[in-house]
Design a protein with these regions (language model features):
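Extracellular, beta-strand-rich glycan-interacting domains
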Residues: 151, 268, 329-330
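Short, surface-exposed beta-strand/loop micro-motifs that present aromatic residues
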Residues: 136-137, 146, 253-255, 316
């Protein structure tokens, strides 16, 4: 008996549409069930995690005294470990002194005499920032200013002698390869002020930095009134702080290096408006802390920020890779040191 093959009747267009609708609904239902299951799983995990955290965060009051003692012991141990790590890292005093030759130390530690007299401070240029205005005259007595920015090598002597925490860019408390003669950075205003006091000097006032660069003719940059990228390190033309002796062609008429560019310099002064200013700069942060003035612009800044009249500012607790400093002194201290 011959078998007759079964042939399924062709579905009508209406039946095909109905089946597609059923398949779509089935897929959506499965997807929703999966999402619901995942959500329940996450919620359960969250409840378990919150329970663990609650157990860790709470304890019986009867145990409080023992826990307080344990916390105190932890603080003592942490402080001890920090001191031990500081003692085992970085430079010893003798080692820091041997980073450079005697001649190099003498050159780096040299100061330049800035004679007494009047100079032009600030500017009336329309495009200048409000805190830079107005132009006015200031008279200063004779003072001395570091010829160079304070270098990593010089700061290493301070760190070694005082066991101060080194800049965060120093790996294991040591200066990165090839940066002995670069200006120290990642230092706060307080770090800079403490270094200056340790070395027997002080931070310069912003007027002292400006006069050392502008001289008596009110120039915009240490070499004159025309911007010249070959005379300073700014606007990423080097890409990092560089040797403090790299730009003799950018020195001021008194012989001070890097008053424009390389790193912005902390000053002793708070940011306050000049007398006669029509607009007041932001002189205080939201927390009531005052800003400190920085001068000179940096390797990261635009060329206009290196204008000698420009006033930058930051909180004294702030540190970055384009802030540094130099020191100043009065005449009497320097004369005594030379005798």
């Amino acid at each position: 008996m011959a078998l007759v093959p079964y042939r399924r009747a062709a579905l009508s267009a209406k039946e095909r549409q109905h089946r597609r609708r059923l398949l779509s609904m089935t897929f959506i239902t499965c997807l929703v069930l999966v999402m619901i299951g995942s959500t329940i799983h996450v919620v359960m995990l969250g409840r378990v995690r919150l329970g663990d955290m609650r157990n860790l965060a709470t304890y019986d009051l009867a145990e409080e005294s023992s826990r307080v003692r344990a916390a105190g012991e932890d603080l003592v141990l942490h402080r001890s470990h920090e001191e031990g790590r500081a003692a085992n890292a970085g430079y010893a005093v003798v080692e820091a002194q041997q980073l450079l030759s005697r001649e190099q130390w003498q050159d780096l530690d040299s100061m330049v005499r800035i004679p007494a007299g009047e100079f032009v401070m600030g500017t009336n240029l329309e495009r200048a920032d409000p805190q830079d205005k107005p132009e006015h005259k200031v008279a200063l007595p004779t003072y001395y200013l570091d010829k160079y920015l304070v270098t990593n090598a010089q700061y290493a002597r301070f760190v070694a002698a005082t066991r101060r925490r080194p800049p965060s860019t120093w790996k294991d408390g040591r200066i990165p390869q090839g940066e002995l003669m670069s200006p120290v950075t990642m230092v706060t205003w307080n770090d800079a002020a403490d270094y200056a006091a340790w070395i027997g000097k002080r931070l310069p006032g912003e007027a002292e930095l400006e006069k050392a660069g502008r001289g008596t003719d009110g120039r915009r940059w240490p070499w004159g009134n025309k911007m010249d990228p070959a005379r300073l390190n700014t606007y990423y033309n080097v890409g990092s702080p560089n040797n403090v002796m790299a730009y003799p062609q950018g020195a001021s008429i008194y012989g001070v290096f890097d008053l424009s560019g390389n790193v912005a310099e902390w000053t002793a002064d708070e940011l306050l408006p000049y007398n006669g200013a029509t607009e007041s700069p932001i002189a205080q942060g939201a927390s009531g802390r005052n800003f400190k003035v920085l001068r000179g612009g940096s390797w990261k800044g635009d060329p206009l920020s290196t204008s000698l009249y420009h006033r930058d500012y930051a909180f004294p607790s702030h540190a970055t890779d384009f802030y540094g400093f130099r020191c100043a002194s009065n005449v009497d201290r320097v004369v005594r040191a030379q005798n």
